[in-house]
């Protein structure tokens, strides 16, 4: 493929509006262009990478018997009314009317559409299981689209759906997809973790996310590719390393997910779902007499603890939330934070919101800093499990400026139930007891769900089972964010190339280091001077030979300066660059391996073998 025939509009500088490195490099290297806020055009290079990603997915899904189809993006609202999501999905849903004033949506996901198709065609357990998927454009009216392809209004997604007559069949397919996703992300070269996750608006029970880890800013060597005349990072002056660290610091760590994983164990979960083991508070072994004490001006846990000269672990804080139409009181250990996802899931609420200070004062006669569970009537109280283990706690007295000491559950106040409501902290013990918990940031690249009968029951997608009974099908759904996967790959494979000039000066620049299986082309042939007949003849000869060996080759046939060509080649990020320069008449070329920075000068007859050896 001739570069002069392709649309690769590289930029000399990073775009000023980019906040993450993947967005900046996709724009600068000519992979994508923004059409409007949250909407991008995938230019030829990006499209080639996306096609390779799709083909990897197709190969892996063939192995588990998943069949590809294509559903419409313009969907009737009636199906979403059947499932109940038309009213509850929120403002992210694109809603529109046709000329007859009928309601339609642009599909953000296709559970309703697929279930409608299946219920019309399958009525017996004998035709199950069914496992289908599509790779198609989705739409979501993001309030604040940002970070390039990571959070857009239009995006490419692989969404799969399976239908089953029994739980064992659903469990088997769910596991097949988990293994399939792991193979796909491994083939993409990603550092990722499968984690326990919240099902969110999708509904259902079991759910796992696949997160590409993005927060490694400490290991500088990971980011650097050194030129052939630099043998070690130790050769680079501290001043240059500081500049590189400063350059890294310009870019936000991509990914809105915080994951929790066990260092030294297998446990991993989204921060919203993570649990831990914790030691009971053993400051007291027996209950002491309840005592009301003045705490003037002490409103926060820190202030109360300091005033009473006690540890925060000895305090219980009281929160008040609206859960749908009900007011709920929540108790937490003083130094813990409420996990609102856990609370929502436990209550089965469609909506929760913290009560205002005015509402609390009107209802209980005290402000938050002095609120406590003792004496509360006609209100539901639930508490985190950790609260049950606290003896002789300090709690608010429901009178401003006062607290109770030595408050004990069962004697002084009642709780409807103790459940896991807290957000875990780093350093706590993994729930399986294997390792301590660590936090990391990452990008969600895949999500699988066991939906059960969430959609099939609502939409009357029933079958006759082996006993002739009419039952709702069981359902699973399985998504991969294909376009955001492209960004995740760049977040992990962006590199800073460091070179030492003949004058012993150190320079560095950003480049892309695509994994071999995903690069838009395998090899970049760069003739330095397109007016040099010997160079162009050798270029044509090498192109033909390499293509004959199955390599995908991009030839830079542009009449540009060598510096421009090399800069663009570094930006584009193909695994191998072959430079055809002044020694072309002798059949000598230069080979550069992108991943290592290694450069060798060889005879043309050694090119194929050299590439195979150096690329391993």
UniProtKB/Swiss-Prot annotation:
Quaternary structure (record): Homodimer.
Reactions listed under catalytic activity: tRNA(Pro) + L-proline + ATP = L-prolyl-tRNA(Pro) + AMP + diphosphate
Predominant localisation class: cytoplasm
Cysteines paired by S-S bonds: none
Signal peptide span: none
Recorded family membership: Belongs to the class-II aminoacyl-tRNA synthetase family. ProS type 1 subfamily.
MF term (GO), any: ATP binding
Notes on the domains: Consists of three domains: the N-terminal catalytic domain, the editing domain and the C-terminal anticodon-binding domain.
Chain segments annotated as coiled-coil in the UniProt record: none
This protein's UniProt keywords: Aminoacyl-tRNA synthetase, ATP-binding, Cytoplasm, Ligase, Nucleotide-binding, Protein biosynthesis
Pfam families, per database record: HGTP_anticodon, tRNA-synt_2b, tRNA_edit
GO CC list: cytosol
Subcellular location: Cytoplasm
Function: Catalyzes the attachment of proline to tRNA(Pro) in a two-step reaction: proline is first activated by ATP to form Pro-AMP and then transferred to the acceptor end of tRNA(Pro). As ProRS can inadvertently accommodate and process non-cognate amino acids such as alanine and cysteine, to avoid such errors it has two additional distinct editing activities against alanine. One activity is designated as 'pretransfer' editing and involves the tRNA(Pro)-independent hydrolysis of activated Ala-AMP.
Annotated source species: Lactococcus lactis subsp. cremoris (strain SK11)
Name by which UniProt lists this protein: Proline--tRNA ligase
GO biological process terms, semicolon-separated: prolyl-tRNA aminoacylation
Gene from which this protein is expressed: proS
E.C. numbers: 6.1.1.15
């Amino acid at each position: 493929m001739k570069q002069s025939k392709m649309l690769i509009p590289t930029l000399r500088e990073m775009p000023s509006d980019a906040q993450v490195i993947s967005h900046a490099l996709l724009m600068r290297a000519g992979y994508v262009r923004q059409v409007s806020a949250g909407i991008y055009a995938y230019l030829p290079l990006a499209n080639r990478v996306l096609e390779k990603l799709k083909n990897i997915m197709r190969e892996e899904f063939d192995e588990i018997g998943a069949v590809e189809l294509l559903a419409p993006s313009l969907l009737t609202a009636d199906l979403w009314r059947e499932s109940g999501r038309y009213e509850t999905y929120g403002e992210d849903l694109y809603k529109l009317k046709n000329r007859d004033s009928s309601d339609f949506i642009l599909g953000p996901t296709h559970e309703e559409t697929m279930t409608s198709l299946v219920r019309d065609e399958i009525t017996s357990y004998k035709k199950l299981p069914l496992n289908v998927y599509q790779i198609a454009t989705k739409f979501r009216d993001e309030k604040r689209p940002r970070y390039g392809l990571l959070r857009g209004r239009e995006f490419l997604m692989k969404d799969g759906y399976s239908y089953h007559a029994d739980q064992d069949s659903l469990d088997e397919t769910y596991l097949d997809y988990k293994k399939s996703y792991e193979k796909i992300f491994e083939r993409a070269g990603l550092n990722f973790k499968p984690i326990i996750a919240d099902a969110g608006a999708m509904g259902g029970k079991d759910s796992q996310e696949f997160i590409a880890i993005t927060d490694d800013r400490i290991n500088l060597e990971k980011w650097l590719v050194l030129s052939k005349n630099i043998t070690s990072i130790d050769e680079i002056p501290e001043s240059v390393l500081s500049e590189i660290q400063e350059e890294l610091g310009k870019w936000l760590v991509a990914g809105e997910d915080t994951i929790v994983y066990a260092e030294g164990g297998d446990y991993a979960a989204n921060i919203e779902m993570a649990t831990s083991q914790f030691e009971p508070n053993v400051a007291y072994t027996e209950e002491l007499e309840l005592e009301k004490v003045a705490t003037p001006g002490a409103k926060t846990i820190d202030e109360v603890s300091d005033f009473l000269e006690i540890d925060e672990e000895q305090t219980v804080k009281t929160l008040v939330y609206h859960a749908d139409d009900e007011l709920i009181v929540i108790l937490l250990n003083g130094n813990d934070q409420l996990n609102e996802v856990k609370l929502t899931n436990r209550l089965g609420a469609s909506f929760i919101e913290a009560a205002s200070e005015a509402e609390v004062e009107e209802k209980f006669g005290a402000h938050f800093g002095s609120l406590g569970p003792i004496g509360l009537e006609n209100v539901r109280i639930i508490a985190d499990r950790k609260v049950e283990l606290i003896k002789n706690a300090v709690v608010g007295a429901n009178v401003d400026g006062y607290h109770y000491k030595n408050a004990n559950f069962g004697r002084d106040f009642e709780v409807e139930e103790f459940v896991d409501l807290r957000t875990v902290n780093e350093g706590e013990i993994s729930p399986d007891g294997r390792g301590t918990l660590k936090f990391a940031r990452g990008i969600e690249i895949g999500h699988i769900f066991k939906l059960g009968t969430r959609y099939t029951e609502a939409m009357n997608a029933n079958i006759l089972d082996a006993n002739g009974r009419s039952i709702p099908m069981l359902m699973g759904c399985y998504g991969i964010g294909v376009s955001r996967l492209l960004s995740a790959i760049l977040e992990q494979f962006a590199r800073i190339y460091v070179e030492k000039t003949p004058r012993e000066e150190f320079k560095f620049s950003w480049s892309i280091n695509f994994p071999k299986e995903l690069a838009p082309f395998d090899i970049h042939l760069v003739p330095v001077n397109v007016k040099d007949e010997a160079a162009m003849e050798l270029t044509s000869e090498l192109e033909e030979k390499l293509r004959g060996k199955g390599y995908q080759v991009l030839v830079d046939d542009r009449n540009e300066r060598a510096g421009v060509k090399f800069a663009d080649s570094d930006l584009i990020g193909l695994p191998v660059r072959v430079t055809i320069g002044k020694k072309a008449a002798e059949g000598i070329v230069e080979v550069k391996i992108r991943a290592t920075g290694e450069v060798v000068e060889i005879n043309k007859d050694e090119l194929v073998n050299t590439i195979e050896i150096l690329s391993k």
